[in-house]
Regions:
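Acidic/histidine-rich catalytic cores of soluble enzymes
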Residues: 19, 122-217, 224
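A short, acidic, flexible beta-alpha connecting loop/helix-capping segment that sits on the rim
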Residues: 10, 237-248, 252
């Protein structure tokens, strides 16, 4: 497993400064945002992704994965993104999200997504990369692991696999759902996101909010024991998506989070 950091919360920093920070925090690489409002926009990918990879490599960092908003092989810059990523040595590409349209649409949407993924799989094969669907809680078609398995069951996971996020999985199934989700998706898992959630009451309603690792719903030791058991070798992307924190506070918390993860990895 390679520990990388998701760049989303650090985009106010120039990339060289961000790279210095990431190296100092002890990460092995970066999960770089290549999407609208990302470090790199889709329009810039051909020119700027190679530059970004070189900047980070100069600081001893890999870029094993990028985060995109791609949901169709036909959309503008989709093929350019896959091609450029491959040329830069980026192996893993996070896809965008398909929103659930509401009751009565589930089965037709599963079929619709499968059709889109067939073309995305062709891009993955052409450029020797792995695309991943992220288990994001809420009104996303990939929120529930069992539904994601139904979507992915006929695809080669080395071309189109699962990008699991135990934090989001625990939001959807905090007792046994996350565990059954890892179980059903085990052979499909190619990327892992790390963040934790807790439930809080706000204005009379329960909301899920990001909390420091080890303080939320996810039993991280068990998660990493399972990943070791299934011989997971892909990137582990740490998501410092804390709300209400300054950048300095996010950096401080991220240092604590990576220490927490490394201590677990050393002990299992």
């Amino acid at each position: 497993m390679k520990l990388v950091i998701f760049s989303k919360k650090f985009q106010e920093l120039p990339l060289p400064e961000f790279g210095d920070l990431v190296a100092d925090m002890g990460f092995e690489g970066v999960d770089l945002t290549v999407r609208p409002t990302g470090y790199i926009t889709p329009e810039e990918v051909v020119e700027k992704l190679p530059e970004a990879v070189d900047i980070l490599k100069a600081r001893g960092l890999e870029v094993p994965m990028i985060t995109t908003a791609i949901t169709s092989a036909e959309e503008p810059y989709a093929e350019e993104t896959f091609k450029t990523a491959s040329e830069c040595g980026v192996k893993y590409i996070k896809l965008g999200y398909w929103k659930y349209k509401g009751f009565g649409h589930l089965r037709s949407q599963i079929d619709e997504i499968r059709r889109a993924l067939k073309d995305i799989q062709a891009l993955s094969k052409k450029y020797n990369v792995t695309a991943g669907m992220h288990t994001h809680s809420g009104m996303n078609m990939s929120a529930e692991p069992a539904i994601l398995w139904e979507i992915l069951k006929d695809f080669n996971p080395d071309l189109v696999g699962a990008y699991i996020d135990p934090g989001h999985m625990a939001v959807e199934g905090g007792l046994g759902g996350w565990l059954m989700g890892m179980d059903i998706l085990a052979e499909k898992i190619r990327m892992v996101a790390v963040k934790d959630y807790g439930w809080f009451k706000k204005d009379g309603k329960w909301i899920a909010r990001t909390v420091p690792l080890g303080e939320g719903l996810v039993p991280w030791r068990k998660v990493f024991e399972i990943l070791k058991r299934i011989e997971f070798k892909g990137p582990v992307s740490l998501h410092s998506e804390y709300k209400g924190m300054s950048l300095e506070e996010i950096i401080e918390q991220t240092r604590k989070d990576i220490k927490y993860v490394r201590e677990i990895l050393k002990s299992i």
